[in-house]
Amino acid sequence: MPVIAADKPLHLTSHDVVNRARRALGTKRVGHTGTLDPLATGVVVLCVDDSTKLVQFMEHDTKEYLAWVSLGAGTPTLDAEGPIEQQAEVPPLDEDHLREVLKGFLGPQQQIPPQYSAIQIGGQRAYAVARAGGQLDLPARDVEIHELELIGMFPSVQAAPRTFDPQSWTPAAAGLTFTLPEPLGEFPTLLLRAHVGSGTYLRSLARDLGAALGVPAHLGGLVRTRAGRYSLRDAVSLENLTEAPTIPDLDALDFPRIEADERLARELRQGKRPAHPQRGRAVVTLGGELVAVVDGDGEHLKVVRAWA
């Protein structure tokens, strides 16, 4: 079975989604291509049976989000799980100034992950240590933020839009309506649209954005609207997994394509390094069938994984 885009509901972990898919689809071979926090909703891409071999190539796909950033209150989890640890008055905010601040977060950068995360150091999960009252020294990680757009400023999460046009992800009178976590109070809230690289934590972004504005902050709500090629508008609920439209393996891979001839396909399947001008990762096909995922140095292709 190929790839499925599932719509994760509030409060479930990504592992919960995988377990439900295993039961619904009658197979243990289910993996996902990117964790989504329990207090977030949206796209979780599932790879089933033979398609699980694609996970290693899809977990680095870029992601797109709608994010509600609440200013004036900080929490240890950096989201609405709470409790509130820091609180401060939020000064009047100017939209032009905010947009300039947001520009400073664009591009490659280093980001410190949340203490409440699945990152493992020395055999210990950060969230397990944090819940036991400890704290790990989490090194900053290289991430990239491609786009960060301010949709609007609102007096609270409750006052911010929750219904969006699924084509443009702009607030709308009708469309998709999202369930957000119970708010921790009435705090000024920024509604953002973000396009980020793999490994970027929107909870950390909320914390860092608050710091740039001189106030504590937390993520009041988060919806993943896209993961790689998969849009939330095409995702199915967990109750409808068995009826989900499936995506062929070839269409699931978001890389440039090289159409091979018989000789090139044969050499790649034999593990050789044929000459080719491709630079970077690519998918090689033959007659519409997946042959290999390769890395090119501008002179030769190196097989990362081949399909018989």
UniProtKB/Swiss-Prot annotation:
Transmembrane segments: none
InterPro entries associated with the record: PsdUridine_synth_cat_dom_sf (IPR020103), PsdUridine_synth_N (IPR002501), tRNA_psdUridine_synth_TruB (IPR014780), TruB_C (IPR032819)
Top EC class for this record: isomerase
One of the GO biological process terms: mRNA pseudouridine synthesis
Reaction catalysed by this enzyme: uridine(55) in tRNA = pseudouridine(55) in tRNA
Swiss-Prot/TrEMBL keywords: Isomerase, tRNA processing
Pfam families linked to this entry: TruB_C_2, TruB_N
Active site positions, chain numbering: D37
Disulfide bridge map: none
Molecular function in Gene Ontology: pseudouridine synthase activity; RNA binding; tRNA pseudouridine(55) synthase activity
Family classification: Belongs to the pseudouridine synthase TruB family. Type 1 subfamily.
Role: Responsible for synthesis of pseudouridine from uracil-55 in the psi GC loop of transfer RNAs.
Protein name: tRNA pseudouridine synthase B
UniProt organism field: Deinococcus radiodurans (strain ATCC 13939 / DSM 20539 / JCM 16871 / CCUG 27074 / LMG 4051 / NBRC 15346 / NCIMB 9279 / VKM B-1422 / R1)
